[in-house]
Design a protein with these regions (language model features):
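Conserved PLP-enzyme active-site core in the AAT-like
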Residues: 121-130, 134-311
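Conserved N-terminal alpha-helix of the aminotransferase class I/II PLP-enzyme fold
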Residues: 2-146, 265-266
Length: 311
């Protein structure tokens, strides 16, 4: 409540009680103010009441919740079921615009603000998790495989002659299909057995680059988190190789945010060589429902280019 309404409340209930309630609410508002000011992940998690207060404050900023509003335009948030509306805290519009997922939606100031804050907080989390030099990221409503496809499709505009993606093998279908769906031919590099671990065959990767011609290779598609006995790819060496041959490098970091080792490998790879983007799943790392991912990178302009590719 604003100060005028609180003053009116004091005419109905004892002013001392109203002041206590006002102070309690101010505690919630201070947390929200800190988030708006810093755009970083809170050191201590919010209570559900603070989260719900904030979401409701944002929701009333969207035009579908304006009092007396009747949306009849092409881009209106309309939901038939009140159950569905409540489930989404009446944030009905969605985010972005048809040309850019990162753009502000004019009729949804609250949803747009929530999106900007989400990307800012997630960027902070990636830095805290070990990738200190990450420059930009954004959340997409797609699982990891489709998010990788989006990265490959963006690279197509930069490397129109490229047909191949060099991929150290991992036995998981979605990352394999992500390359085929984007229209490229995966060049599968078998791993080598080192002790009781399967590791990246760097010699074969380099030989494939030389055989195919660097200009015909869209990127190297490496992996951090995977199933035993395979260990994370040798990101530092691959990143150095990509820098040497001027080939993009996309990292499948599906499970990796929760692993300091995986995040360290990405940071080191970017430091010594080239990593253009790395993709991680929301459900695996943040324990939310399946169907979201984070696309991040070290060149802000390239990450923005990917976001503008989102249809």
């Amino acid at each position: 409540m604003n100060i005028e309404n609180l003053t009116l409340c004091e005419k109905i209930v004892s002013p001392s009680y109203i002041r206590q309630g006002s102070q309690a609410r101010r505690g919630h508002e201070q947390l929200i103010r800190h988030l708006l000011d810093q755009g970083k992940c809170p050191e201590e998690g919010w209570s559900e009441s603070t989260v719900e207060l904030f979401l409701n404050e944002l929701a009333v900023m969207d035009s579908n919740n304006f009092l007396g509003n009747c949306g009849v335009g092409e881009r209106e948030g309309r939901v038939a079921s009140s159950l569905v509306a409540r489930r989404h805290y009446r944030l009905i519009h969605g985010i972005g615009r048809s040309g850019d997922i990162a753009a502000v939606q004019p009729k949804a100031a609250g949803s747009s603000l929530l999106n900007k804050l989400t990307n800012s907080v997630v960027l902070d989390i990636l830095k805290i998790s070990g990738v200190r030099s990450v420059a930009s990221c954004f959340v997409v409503p797609m699982a990891t495989g489709m998010s990788l496809t989006l990265c490959f499709l963006t690279l197509r505009h930069r490397r129109p002659k490229a047909r191949y993606i060099i991929w150290p093998r991992i036995d998981q279908k979605s990352c394999f299909k992500s390359m085929i769906t984007a229209g490229f031919e995966p060049v599968v590099v078998e791993n080598v057995l080192v002790g009781d671990e399967l590791r990246t065959d760097l010699e074969t990767v380099q030989r494939k680059i030389q055989e195919l011609g660097a200009e015909n290779v869209l990127c190297v598609h490496s992996t951090t988190s995977c199933f035993a006995p395979r260990v994370p790819d040798r990101l530092e060496e691959l990143a150095t190789m990509c820098a040497k041959y001027d080939i993009p490098h996309i990292v499948n970091n599906a499970y990796g945010v929760q692993s300091s080792k995986c995040m360290h490998l990405i940071q080191q790879g970017a430091r010594v060589g080239r990593i253009d983007a790395f993709v991680q799943s929301l459900d695996k790392n943040f324990m939310v429902p399946v169907g979201g991912a984070i696309i991040a990178g070290f060149d802000e302009s390239f990450v923005q280019e990917i976001s503008k590719m989102y249809p």
